[in-house]
């Protein structure tokens, strides 16, 4: 167990010097993610984070030099990272693959890039733009770039994505380091039901109920009926004693 895993446990249970916390958030390697998953329930967590991933949609107007660079920016994270591109143009696909081979030669994490691109990467060619939308919503990627002539037309069509980057001058590393939105994002398809970390992640709600006597009496028969159907007679009795009193 590495120091970071121990830190997760220390925060969840508390120590003589560290007070117990209610929620643990933030990215980490597979060991940190596993520690957070094991401790979910003891504390709340932001999400179950897996390896980094990117889906790029590119039409015939995209620049293969940029596309290759952006795919590798995620592939370099680790050997389990996923970098997938879908394009409407066979020419763009071929040129992007050539650029990956050219650019990776001078990158420091070439071995990791080569492994992740070979095992978890893909370049898909489809003339059907709707297929790209369908694929995106099924994969629910952590990051997605739309590099197309009119990228904003895809807003509202792609629902399941952690962070959406629009246009050739909005590369994924912009979101990692500078743009502003939190880049702790759902991975492994969990963008179907998880959202990026945000201020609302640190807010919890409670319910408040206050009935008058008349309001409770109006609802009493309905509550008693439901409780008795469930054979929870003490529930029903809690209402009956007030109705009778």
Regions found by a protein language model. Name each.
Residues 12, 24-27, 48, 57-59, ...:
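Short beta-strand segments
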Residues 5, 18-22, 26-27, 42-44, ...:
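Short coil/turn connectors at secondary-structure junctions
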Residues 30-131:
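ALDH superfamily catalytic-core signature
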Residues 1-3:
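Short, small-residue-biased leader/transition segments that mark boundaries at the very start
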Residues 7-8, 31-33, 39, 152, ...:
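Glycine-rich nucleotide phosphate-binding loop and flanking beta-alpha elements
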Residues 7-16:
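Glycine-rich, mobile lid/loop segments that gate access to catalytic sites or pores
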Residues 137-245:
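C-terminal core of ALDH-fold dehydrogenases
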Residues 7, 128-131, 153-154:
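Short acidic active-site motifs
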């Amino acid at each position: 167990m590495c120091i970071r895993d121990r830190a997760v446990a220390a925060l969840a249970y508390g120590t003589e010097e560290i007070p117990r916390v209610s929620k643990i958030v933030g990215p980490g390697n597979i060991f940190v993610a596993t520690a957070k998953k094991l401790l979910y329930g003891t504390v709340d967590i932001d999400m179950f984070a897996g390896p980094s991933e990117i889906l790029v949609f590119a039409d015939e107007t995209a620049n293969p030099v940029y596309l290759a660079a952006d795919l590798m920016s995620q592939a370099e994270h680790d050997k389990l990272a996923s970098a997938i591109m879908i394009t409407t143009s066979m020419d763009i696909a071929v040129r992007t693959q050539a650029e990956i081979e050219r650019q990776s030669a001078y990158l420091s994490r070439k071995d990791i890039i080569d492994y992740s691109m070979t095992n978890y990467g893909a370049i898909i060619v489809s003339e059907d733009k709707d297929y790209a939308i369908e694929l995106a919503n099924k994969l629910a990627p952590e990051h997605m770039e739309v590099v197309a002539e009119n990228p904003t037309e895809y807003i509202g069509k792609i629902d399941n994505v952690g962070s959406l980057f629009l246009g050739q001058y909005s590369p994924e590393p912009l979101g990692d380091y500078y743009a502003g939105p939190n880049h702790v994002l759902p991975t492994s398809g969990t963008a179907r039901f998880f959202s990026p970390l945000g201020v609302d992640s640190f807010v919890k709600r409670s319910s408040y109920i206050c009935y008058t006597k008349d309001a409770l009496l109006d609802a009493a028969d309905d509550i008693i009926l439901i409780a008795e159907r469930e054979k929870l007679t003490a529930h029903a009795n809690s209402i009956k004693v007030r109705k009778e009193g």
